[in-house]
């Protein structure tokens, strides 16, 4: 069944100064920026860039930045990421994290940066365990933080977990690697980065749907998380039958050059998986697995 949500990724340029000055200015900026983005786009989810409050290590959920964003999540009734340095109360360990607050301002879950960049280790930041999913009302989501984007093993972990949505919180952009993550994991990718490069929203075929720009500090898109990814081979000949039977209730998006399609359910009566099963479509991973098997059979 269709699962539409509005997602917004917001850019920000962290400030400098004493720890107290940084916190006060950052909190003031966040109230303004999140408020403007939320009023303009009415999002279900807002993604913010990495370690948004510099030198503001805090416990979660009681830390000041977490509490500020929790109040904004409640005010605007949306999920909001919390990109901070989390300090554990018992051990004193520090992690670079992407927390996720729900519409009530409650902490839904935390993703810890898999591989911090080397200066972070010098400052005591510890690595996270790897891919993990945070449960939300619109399905499980995965987190990725900055330098993590470079490591294929983390992407492979997410590929096995099969989230429909990846949240990327970062200092740097990553360029086409963002699009490859979306394509390879077959997930929507919402990237929030520091000002100077665009925030992005990318679909499961690696197509960029929306970007921020020099005039607007956020990117916004309405996306449908009820989808299945298939290859054109063995499937394309059936598309006309699907359209004939279901019309606008099923949307098929085919990206040029890549050789894939995304099947979206646009109705409450059936899921995209139901459509795939009814018309015996072959999912992308199944097609690749079958192709590998076929190769093995023809080696001898």
Name every feature range the model reports, one short phrase each.
Residues 4-19, 23, 112, 140-148, ...:
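Active-site-proximal beta-strand elements of phosphoester/diester hydrolases
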Residues 4-11, 22, 37-39, 45, ...:
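Ligand-binding pocket scaffold of soluble enzyme catalytic domains
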Residues 63-81, 149-253:
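CN hydrolase (nitrilase-like) catalytic-core segments centered on the catalytic cysteine
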Residues 89-161, 170, 176, 184, ...:
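Active-site catalytic loop in hydrolytic enzyme cores
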Residues 226-300:
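A short C-terminal boundary segment appended to hydrolase-like catalytic domains
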């Amino acid at each position: 069944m269709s699962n539409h949500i509005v997602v917004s990724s917001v850019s920000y340029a962290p400030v400098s100064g004493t720890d107290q000055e940084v916190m006060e200015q950052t909190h003031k900026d966040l109230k303004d920026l999140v408020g403007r983005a939320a009023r303009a786009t009415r999002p279900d989810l807002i993604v913010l860039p990495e370690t948004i409050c510099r030198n503001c290590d805090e416990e979660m959920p009681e830390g000041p930045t977490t509490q500020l964003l929790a109040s904004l999540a409640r005010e605007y009734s949306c999920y909001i990421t919390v990109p901070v340095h989390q300090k554990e109360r018992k051990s004193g360990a520090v992690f670079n994290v992407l927390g996720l607050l729900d519409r009530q301002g409650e902490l839904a879950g935390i993703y810890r940066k898999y591989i911090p960049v080397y200066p972070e280790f010098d400052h005591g930041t510890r690595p996270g365990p790897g891919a993990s999913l945070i449960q939300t009302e619109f399905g499980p989501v995965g987190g990725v933080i900055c330098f993590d984007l470079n490591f294929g093993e983390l992407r492979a972990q997410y590929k096995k977990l099969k989230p429909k949505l990846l949240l990327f919180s970062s200092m740097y952009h990553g360029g086409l690697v963002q699009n490859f993550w979306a394509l390879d994991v077959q997930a929507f990718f919402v990237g929030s980065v520091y000002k100077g490069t665009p925030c992005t929203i990318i679909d499961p075929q690696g197509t960029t749907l929306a970007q921020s720009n020099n005039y607007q500090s956020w990117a916004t898109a309405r996306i449908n998380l009820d989808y299945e990814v298939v290859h054109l081979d063995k499937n394309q000949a059936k598309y006309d039958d699907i359209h004939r039977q279901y019309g606008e209730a099923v949307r098929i998006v085919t990206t040029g050059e890549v050789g894939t399609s995304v099947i979206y359910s646009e109705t409450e009566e059936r899921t995209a998986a139901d459509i795939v099963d009814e018309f015996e479509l072959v999912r992308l991973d199944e097609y690749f697995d079958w192709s590998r098997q076929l190769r093995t059979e023809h080696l001898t």
